[in-house]
Swiss-Prot record:
<dbReference type="Pfam" id="PF09153">
    <property type="entry name" value="MGMT_N"/>
</dbReference>
<dbReference type="InterPro" id="IPR054936">
    <property type="entry name" value="DNA_protcyst_Mta_Thcoc"/>
</dbReference>
<dbReference type="GO" id="GO:0006281">
    <property type="term" value="P:DNA repair"/>
</dbReference>
<dbReference type="InterPro" id="IPR036388">
    <property type="entry name" value="WH-like_DNA-bd_sf"/>
</dbReference>
<feature type="active site" description="Nucleophile; methyl group acceptor">
    <location>
        <position position="142"/>
    </location>
</feature>
<dbReference type="InterPro" id="IPR015236">
    <property type="entry name" value="MGMT_N"/>
</dbReference>
<dbReference type="GO" id="GO:0032259">
    <property type="term" value="P:methylation"/>
</dbReference>
<dbReference type="InterPro" id="IPR001497">
    <property type="entry name" value="MethylDNA_cys_MeTrfase_AS"/>
</dbReference>
<dbReference type="InterPro" id="IPR036217">
    <property type="entry name" value="MethylDNA_cys_MeTrfase_DNAb"/>
</dbReference>
<dbReference type="InterPro" id="IPR036631">
    <property type="entry name" value="MGMT_N_sf"/>
</dbReference>
<keyword id="KW-0963">Cytoplasm</keyword>
<dbReference type="Pfam" id="PF01035">
    <property type="entry name" value="DNA_binding_1"/>
</dbReference>
<dbReference type="GO" id="GO:0005737">
    <property type="term" value="C:cytoplasm"/>
</dbReference>
<dbReference type="GO" id="GO:0003908">
    <property type="term" value="F:methylated-DNA-[protein]-cysteine S-methyltransferase activity"/>
</dbReference>
<comment type="similarity">
    <text>Belongs to the MGMT family.</text>
</comment>
<dbReference type="InterPro" id="IPR014048">
    <property type="entry name" value="MethylDNA_cys_MeTrfase_DNA-bd"/>
</dbReference>
<protein>
    <recommendedName>
        <fullName>Methylated-DNA--protein-cysteine methyltransferase</fullName>
        <ecNumber>2.1.1.63</ecNumber>
    </recommendedName>
</protein>
Amino acid sequence: MLTYKTFKILGREILIGVVWEEKIQGIAYSLDGLEFLKDQLSRVTSHLKSRGVKVNLLEEKSRYPDLVFDVLKGKIGNEKGFEELSLEGLTRFEIKVYSWLVKNVKRGEVITYGKVAKALKTSPIAVGGAMKRNPYPIIVPCHRVVGKNNPWLYTPKPSYKKFLLEVEGWIS
């Protein structure tokens, strides 16, 4: 199923789209209107399908966009949101990275790819790849992972990463 909804925060509109069945299969968001959201949802669903996840894009109401927005606002924590994710189609490594990130990097904090890699005994490039493939942005806060020399790596739009960090109070 697919549900999307428009919200306002910091004087801007954010559209949040969620693909779901029993639990959340994928999330996309847009600060640039419905067409960009549809492009992002297409990217997420293609990725899920390539991993063998059955996706139904029939539009139906659900509470999931509100849940994602509540995580963004800090009304509920990322760990609570993480419980609502299906984790279908993820590798063991991706689950390990996403779980660690949700538990260890809190709202308003950032961490480098290198530090995540060190904590998980892997390479920064492997961590970056997992962040790039993250089908659950906002709940799995890949925006909190930054490059040592370039904080805006692995994001479709650097302005989006900046916006999420601004909402969380890291950038003022």
